Regions:
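Cysteine-centered iron-sulfur cluster-binding motifs in ferredoxin-type domains/subunits
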Residues: 24-43, 68-88
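Non-ligating segments of multi-cofactor redox enzymes
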Residues: 1-29, 35-39, 46-55, 62, ...
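A compact, surface-exposed functional segment
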Residues: 65
Length: 194
């Protein structure tokens, strides 16, 4: 991994403004203290660390940032956001970058997107996460049907997986389904594949 940011790449001067407008964060105030990466639980799989992503946004390095694996590997745990001395919600910036990348058809880690859609499909149907349903959908979408099947007996023995989804009382699942439907309609209007 090369830690240097390649400044010879084409810059998009409007990119910084677009990220700041869409995320509601003043990325320009990041002074590269490194607090965001100090406790990042996913940083070990990043090709660019969070502070490098922020610097790339500041410099208008749109292609480098939107093609990065890091924006897809971010867990959205907000550890970075809580540690930022300038109160930049770095997790929100990463989310914004994922949306921008998807809108342009850039998906650096397709498996993550497949998992994301599998998770959202179970939430839409059942109103909350349904682990086995998410796993089955992900395995089918990624064509990795027997991946991690050997872990199932342990997970079942520890009661970490339920065969049936948990129910939500008082029409909660339907309400969540309506929210998800509105999201899909909005995404289509904005040109993003829901």
């Amino acid at each position: 991994m090369n830690d240097a940011i390649d400044l010879t790449r084409k810059r998009d001067r409007d990119f910084t403004a677009a990220v700041e407008a869409q995320s509601g964060q003043n990325v320009s105030t990041c002074y590269q203290c490194g607090n965001c990466l100090a406790g990042c639980p996913a940083g070990f799989v990043y090709d660019l660390q969070a502070n490098q992503i922020m610097r790339g946004v500041q410099l208008g390095l749109k292609d480098q940032v939107l093609n990065s694996r890091s924006i897809w590997m971010c867990l959205s745990c907000s550890t970075c956001s809580l540690r930022c001395p300038n109160n930049i919600d770095v997790a929100e910036v990463m989310e914004t970058l994922r949306h921008m990348a998807r809108k342009e058809g850039r998906v650096a880690v397709p498996k993550v997107e497949k998992f994301w859609f599998s998770f959202l499909d179970t939430v839409r149907k059942f109103g909350r996460t349904y682990e086995i349903g998410t796993m089955v959908l992900y395995m089918l979408r990624s064509l990795r049907v027997f991946t991690d099947v050997d872990l199932a007996p342990q997970a079942l023995a520890k009661q970490k997986l339920g065969f049936k989804p948990h129910s939500i009382p008082n029409g909660g699942a339907e309400a969540v389904g309506r929210i998800m439907t509105r999201y899909k309609e909005r995404a289509k209007r904005e040109g993003v594949r829901p």
